[in-house]
Amino acid sequence: MAIVLVPNVQMSHLVSEWSVPAVRQFSLSLARSHRLIRYDSTGSGLSPSASPRFDLESLAADIPALLDGLALDRAALFGNITGGLPAMTFAAANPGRVSHLVLWNSFARNTDHGANPRLTSLFAMAATDWELFTESISQAALGWRDSEAARGWAATLRAATEPVSFHRYLAERQSWDVTDLLAHIQCPTLVLFDPTNRLASEERSRELAAAIPNATFMRATSESGMPDAPTIALIEQFLRDAKTATFDRPPGGLSLREVDVLRELATGATNAEIAERLSISINTVARHLTHIYVKTGSSNRVEAVRYAERRELVD
């Protein structure tokens, strides 16, 4: 099974966070049994952007870009804190592409998290003393019991972003709210709450689980802010035992994404328009079209659309 780790927005850096032992333990443990996919969201870490956008739709667009680039129809998603919101956004809109959803210390609305008095005061500090802010928010989450890991997370935050980008993120996340999407999430969902994280809320996690149709809430244990060995075992059991929704497979061996491209093709859209609508690159569209032509026995766009019409893939 492929698992995509959807990162805590503006707080991930693939190289820097590897210095935190708990990150390595968590990642390597899952990678023993699964195809693990780690990434930095656009605008942070190793995915810099001159003009990053932090609305949920833009953040969620990273997920299909990864799946398409790796030729994956479907994957499980692990949403890490704020990363849970783009994960839920994608899962609600693309039920056929998400097999399981794991939410770690996540929430449904910015007001559930960003309005936390402790966080509010910490975010205010970011405008006046960036280094002190990074140290303080890491220490606030983990407590003084784990100062070495907190320093590692603070260094990761400084590597992940810069003050200008972080303040833009804080402004855009004010409108974050996936409440209306939760009922549309069809996959089995595991909502995990770590009581040692002082910036998370058990009440909000329970509300989240109650609003998702096929969700289970569990209190969990952690190591330096990440799931520890017992919780990793719990996640593994969930991925193994939870029944996933079944979806009819497209004809001709077409992937779900290729069907998406074919449907856009039937509207008369150009490659550039398809790329924009599906949030993928033009090169990815061209690659999908090549596969579509081979699988449908078509030599051009018109023949491919006729195939789709015969197979009732388009209206």
Q: What do these predicted regions represent?
A:
Residues E57-A75:
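Conserved acidic catalytic loop of the alpha/beta-hydrolase fold
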Residues R198-R204:
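Conserved alpha/beta-hydrolase "acid-adjacent" motif
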Residues I185, V191-F193:
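Short beta-strand/loop motif that positions the catalytic acidic residue
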Residues R151-D180, H184:
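Hydrophobic, aromatic-rich cap/lid helix
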Residues F247-T290, V294-T296, E303-R306, R310-D315:
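Helix-turn-helix DNA-binding segment
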Residues M1-P48:
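Conserved HGGG/HGGXW glycine-rich cap/lid loop of the alpha/beta-hydrolase fold
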